[in-house]
């Protein structure tokens, strides 16, 4: 069976409108790609006619494919102009669907990066001009791909990812958080004050309104504090507040030492006097006794007990001085709530009980220490720890710790084999981003080129707020040197918590590599 005759080749100059005959010939030509492989590759030329014929046929198919010209509908093309002095492509007509994930606006004009324009030109979406002359794909490759714009390797990776459906944007160094922002755990994507509609978010309460509320609260409390400073005489002690609300500390009363301000209710009579705290005697100078340190006695301060075995379930109303002006306190009986508490003991297996029993042997209750109980503040507790540390250092044997060469560990530090290995290990665990902040000033070598977003995010992708990338891409050629450790640390620090991927291009074949952290296992049982 004879093969069908192929239509005559029609050479059409770029940008010219086709006639009916030329359009029919261009549309009726074969749309199949040439065969990529013609059998196994020969190791050496043998000079045979069959081998020469296979080579000739492969070359003809390749040149025929390269010489084939694209025919597109003129009305569906977006006119664009290449501006080499500015390094971008400016659109002359409204953009199409590609504008959702590609391009940027500047000075009220729609513009494309060179790699985006070249990709759209290959896809048949734009009509590119330069100096009012249409450009072919070959001419666009020569003009748009330079060392000052985008290299050929970078465009190969860009077009490869775009054909796979990913959203590819240029990497913005300004999106890298500073060391101070990373220390505060600030995320760049959270710093934007725009919501889904592009409008600025309104906070629930502005600082001005907060200041007004605080000022109104101070004004409402000020008359009460003045009135409480000079209480009127009364016959019933239960109706007279025994505390002064303008001070947070307990104040001295006429009949006894002090009473806790934060008690749940006013206690009538002197039966509650002297309950709460005691004062140490201060120094007396010129007949005036100085204020001593307060010592709270928490055994005598009644806190609400909500346990089911509690016999006192009636909670008194709080003092009116502790409540806002428009809030009234009342007594509450918590008996019904105490009966609803779940008092079932946790059921543990035998292995869990043994594990808890073994762990309890090495646990010490800090609150059971008498010296700790005598501490009334964090400052005294820290001073106690410091004194104990000095005492332990003085007990060390001088023939071991008084020499230039000392032991690696003290007996108190050897709590487990894992702790001993951690202290005596020479190689410490490290990560690639560690120490990368001081390497940011060093330039040269590999750089992050593209931010890659997943293909399923195209429908919801927004260029003004793209969010966190799926990966960041570094591009290198097969004949280029392998990146050193400084470059890897610098790039990993720039990438942050976004995975860093290296694209290696070998004559059109693209491979992707990445570095992952791993932890070596430690045998702490021997």
Curated annotation (Swiss-Prot):
The modification Phosphotyrosine is found at residue 180. One of its GO terms (cellular component) is nucleoplasm. GO terms for biological process: mRNA processing; tRNA splicing, via endonucleolytic cleavage and ligation; tRNA-type intron splice site recognition and cleavage. Pfam families: tRNA_int_end_N2. Keywords: Acetylation, Disease variant, Methylation, mRNA processing, Neurodegeneration, Nucleus, Phosphoprotein, Pontocerebellar hypoplasia, tRNA processing. The modification Phosphoserine is found at residues 178, 267. Residues 220-229 have a biased composition (Low complexity). The modification Omega-N-methylarginine is found at residue 316. Residues 27-47, 192-290 are annotated as: Disordered. It is found in: Nucleus; Nucleus, Nucleolus. Its main location: nucleus. The modification N-acetylmethionine is found at residue 1. tRNA splicing endonuclease is a heterotetramer composed of TSEN2, TSEN15, TSEN34/LENG5 and TSEN54. tRNA splicing endonuclease complex also contains proteins of the pre-mRNA 3'-end processing machinery such as CLP1, CPSF1, CPSF4 and CSTF2. Also belongs to a complex containing isoform 2 of SEN2. Belongs to the SEN54 family. Non-catalytic subunit of the tRNA-splicing endonuclease complex, a complex responsible for identification and cleavage of the splice sites in pre-tRNA. It cleaves pre-tRNA at the 5' and 3' splice sites to release the intron. The products are an intron and two tRNA half-molecules bearing 2',3' cyclic phosphate and 5'-OH termini. There are no conserved sequences at the splice sites, but the intron is invariably located at the same site in the gene, placing the splice sites an invariant distance from the constant structural features of the tRNA body. It is linked to Pontocerebellar hypoplasia 4: A disorder characterized by an abnormally small cerebellum and brainstem, severe neonatal encephalopathy, microcephaly, myoclonus and muscular hypertonia. There is a severe inferior olivary and pontine neuronal loss and a diffuse white matter gliosis. This is tRNA-splicing endonuclease subunit Sen54. It comes from Homo sapiens.
């Amino acid at each position: 069976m004879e093969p069908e005759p192929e239509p005559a080749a029609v050479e059409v100059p770029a940008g010219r409108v086709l006639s009916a005959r030329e359009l029919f010939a261009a549309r009726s030509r074969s749309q199949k790609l040439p065969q990529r492989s013609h059998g196994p590759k020969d190791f050496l030329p043998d000079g045979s006619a069959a081998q020469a014929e296979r080579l000739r046929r492969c070359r003809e198919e390749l040149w025929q494919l390269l010489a084939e010209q694209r025919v597109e509908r003129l009305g569906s093309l977006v006119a664009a102009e290449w501006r080499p002095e500015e390094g971008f492509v400016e659109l002359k007509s409204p953009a199409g669907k590609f504008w959702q994930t590609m391009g940027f606006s500047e000075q009220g004009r729609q513009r494309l990066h060179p790699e985006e324009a070249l990709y759209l030109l290959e896809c048949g979406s734009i009509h590119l001009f330069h100096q009012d002359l249409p450009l072919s794909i070959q001419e666009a490759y020569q003009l748009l791909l330079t060392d000052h714009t985008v290299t050929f390797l970078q465009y190969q990776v860009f077009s490869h990812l775009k054909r796979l459906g990913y959203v590819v944007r240029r990497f913005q160094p300004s999106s890298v958080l500073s060391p101070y922002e990373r220390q505060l755990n600030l995320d760049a994507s959270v710093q934007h004050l725009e919501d889904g509609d592009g409008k600025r978010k309104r906070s629930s309460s502005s600082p001005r309104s907060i200041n007004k509320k605080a000022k109104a609260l101070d004004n409402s409390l000020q008359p009460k504090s003045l009135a409480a400073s000079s209480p009127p005489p009364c016959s019933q002690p239960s109706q007279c507040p025994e505390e002064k609300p303008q001070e947070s500390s307990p104040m001295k009363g006429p009949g006894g030492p002090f009473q806790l301000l934060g008690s749940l209710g006013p206690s009538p009579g002197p039966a509650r006097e002297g309950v709460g705290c005691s004062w140490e005697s201060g120094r007396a100078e010129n007949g005036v006794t100085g204020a001593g340190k307060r010592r709270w006695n928490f055994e005598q301060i009644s806190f609400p007990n909500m346990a089911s075995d509690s016999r006192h379930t009636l909670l008194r109303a709080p003092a009116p001085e502790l409540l806002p002006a428009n809030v009234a306190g009342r007594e509450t009986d918590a008996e019904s709530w105490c009966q609803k508490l779940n008092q079932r003991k946790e059921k543990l297996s035998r292995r869990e009980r043994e594990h808890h029993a073994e762990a309890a042997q090495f646990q010490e209750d800090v609150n059971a220490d008498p010296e700790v109980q005598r501490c009334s503040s964090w400052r005294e507790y820290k001073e106690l720890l410091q004194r104990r540390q000095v005492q332990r250092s003085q007990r060390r044997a001088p023939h071991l710790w008084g020499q230039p060469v000392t032991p690696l560990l003290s007996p108190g530090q050897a709590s487990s084999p894992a702790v001993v290995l951690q202290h005596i290990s020479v190689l410490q665990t490290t990560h690639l981003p560690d120490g990368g902040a001081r390497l940011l000033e060093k330039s040269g070598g590999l750089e992050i080129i593209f931010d890659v977003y997943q293909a399923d995010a195209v429908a919801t992708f927004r260029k003004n707020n793209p969010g966190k990338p799926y990966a960041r891409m570094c591009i290198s050629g097969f004949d280029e040197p392998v990146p050193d450790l400084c470059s890897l640390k610098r790039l990993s620090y720039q990438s942050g918590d976004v995975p860093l991927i290296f694209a290696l291009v070998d004559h059109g074949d693209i491979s992707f590599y990445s570095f992952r952290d791993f932890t070596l296992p430690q045998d702490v049982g021997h």
